């Protein structure tokens, strides 16, 4: 199975049928997205949190309370279901992780408002096309992600620290990586930090908070991008009564072409 050539519809069908795999490298050319669903009485607070923290929380679409599909799935919107079409989910109750199911249907409520947030997996295909290596993608692994010491701007009852994803980039190609990804602001855009991880509160780069440990070559430099797992750090810090998210690295694959998020 060549996961890069599978259509978004086919990918969602496989995940709906129970396949659990990180989605880096799937359905090349199409945008991937983070998900968080929260009770309606917290929806404004999260919308404000995202507006105040656009690097980690670039909103692609907001669904009405109880809605389970959106326009980002294009002509296939009614076929899609955000409760089943990511490979794996995380269920939080009062900030505690209580389950990591392959389907969120059993936890769904009609008062949940869902936010679909841009994901950096979207710009990995353009990086590869430009000859910039993406180590975890080459190895079929999940991207490493870390909670930093950098506080997000709070909103209402919601607060938490920035989460970043790491890609080890050859020093000679860091400028290329910055140039390419800066053209995709709706999916986190340019890096937020390059170099020494300790400067953003990461003590051990080989022990990520989410995902797999990084792979690197001797000439590589650590490059960090804002990450859509930041809302999960916010959930663990703010302890809302219920939140449904994707599992880190296990994204919703949309029908939106990645070039649609590229700016000049």
Curated annotation (Swiss-Prot):
Keywords: Lyase. It holds the Pfam family D-Glu_cyclase. The keyword Lyase applies. Disulfide bonds: none annotated. GO terms for molecular function: lyase activity. It is an enzyme of class 4 (lyase). Belongs to the D-glutamate cyclase family. PANTHER family: D-GLUTAMATE CYCLASE, MITOCHONDRIAL (PTHR32022:SF10). This is Putative hydro-lyase Cgl2544/cg2803.
């Amino acid at each position: 199975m060549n996961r890069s050539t599978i259509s978004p519809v086919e990918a969602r069908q496989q995940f709906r049928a129970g396949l659990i795999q990180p989605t880096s490298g799937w359905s090349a050319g199409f945008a991937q997205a983070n998900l968080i669903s929260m009770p309606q009485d917290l929806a404004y607070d999260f919308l404000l949190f995202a507006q105040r923290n656009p690097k980690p929380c670039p909103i692609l679409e907001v669904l009405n309370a109880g809605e389970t599909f959106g326009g980002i799935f294009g002509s296939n919107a009614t076929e899609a279901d955000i409760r089943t079409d990511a490979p794996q989910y995380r269920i939080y109750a009062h900030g505690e992780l209580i389950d990591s199911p392959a389907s969120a249907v059993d936890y769904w409520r009609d008062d949940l408002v869902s936010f679909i947030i841009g994901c950096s997996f979207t710009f990995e295909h353009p990086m590869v096309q430009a000859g910039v290596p993406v180590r975890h993608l080459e190895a079929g692994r999940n991207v490493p992600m870390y909670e930093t010491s950098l506080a997000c701007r709070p909103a209402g009852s919601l607060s938490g620290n920035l989460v970043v994803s790491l890609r080890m980039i050859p020093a000679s190609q860091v400028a290329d990586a910055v140039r390419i990804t800066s053209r995709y602001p709706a999916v986190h855009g340019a890096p937020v930090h390059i170099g020494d991880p300790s400067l953003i509160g990461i003590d051990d780069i080989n022990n990520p908070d989410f995902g797999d440990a990084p792979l690197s070559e001797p000439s590589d430099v650590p490059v960090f991008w804002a990450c859509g797992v930041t809302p999960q750090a916010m959930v663990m810090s703010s302890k809302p009564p219920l939140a449904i998210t994707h599992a880190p690295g296990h994204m919703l694959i949309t029908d939106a072409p990645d070039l649609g998020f590229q700016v000049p």
